[in-house]
């Protein structure tokens, strides 16, 4: 009989681990840390992708745009029946939110898996504890290319809750980014209403 046919696979249903008496290694659903920085970043990006593609995330976005009718660019005031409008995560970015949730688990030594983190991130959205802005697609691209600053007064959602409760799980570079975004207002941003005719008329 082939050795592979003799392998028995068992499971510890309490800890959600697979194991075999023939091998010294186990496979756990959850982890408590990462082997490398590359694995850490790959995990965060994977969670970010799953969240964006989830039905729940789409429902959150559609609720903002279709039900609440927050469907115009906060800068140009162009509406979604004229242009493509996107929801931009401002404080925190979606990557920053996932990073904070992962770091929290690591610091508190509580095990987690991809789906724990994704569920927690979606729940933060449904608790309205993320800061977001609706932007024209080209404005969204402009922001991510470092060509646009967004006044904090335009940001919706309870981003202050995130700052108070989750920012402690981020590193200095992340905190600097948050502080710089909090400091932007209509008086010191990189553009004026006169730059956008539609906005000037609003």
Protein language model features and the residues they cover:
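Intrinsically disordered, low-complexity peptide-like regions
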Residues: 3, 8-10, 87, 138, ...
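A boundary/linker detector
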Residues: 1-81, 169-202
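Hydrophobic transmembrane helical bundles of multi-pass organellar membrane proteins
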Residues: 72, 89-90, 146
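Short coil/turn linker and secondary-structure boundary residues
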Residues: 35, 92, 113, 117, ...
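Short, structured coil/loop segments at alpha-helix boundaries
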Residues: 53-54, 112-115, 136
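Histidine-centered nuclease catalytic patch
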Residues: 78-131
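A detector for short metal-coordination/catalytic motifs
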Residues: 125-202
């Amino acid at each position: 009989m082939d050795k592979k046919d003799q392998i028995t696979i068992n499971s510890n249903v309490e800890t959600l681990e697979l194991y075999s008496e023939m091998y010294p290694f186990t496979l756990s659903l959850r982890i408590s840390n990462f082997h490398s920085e590359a694995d850490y970043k790959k995990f965060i990006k994977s969670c970010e992708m799953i969240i964006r593609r989830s039905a729940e995330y789409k429902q959150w976005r559609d609720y903002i745009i279709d039900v609440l009718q927050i469907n115009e660019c906060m800068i140009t005031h162009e509406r979604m029946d004229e242009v493509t409008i996107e929801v931009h995560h401002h404080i925190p970015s979606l990557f920053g939110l996932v990073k904070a949730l992962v770091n929290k688990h690591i610091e508190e030594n509580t095990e987690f898996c991809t789906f724990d983190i994704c569920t927690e991130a979606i729940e933060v959205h449904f608790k309205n504890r993320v800061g977001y802005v609706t932007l024209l697609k080209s404005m969204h691209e402009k922001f991510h290319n470092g060509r646009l600053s967004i006044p904090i007064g335009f940001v919706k959602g309870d981003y202050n809750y995130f700052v108070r409760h989750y920012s402690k799980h981020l590193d200095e570079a992340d905190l600097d980014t948050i502080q710089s975004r909090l400091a932007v207002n209509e008086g010191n941003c990189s553009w004026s209403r006169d730059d956008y005719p539609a906005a000037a008329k609003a």
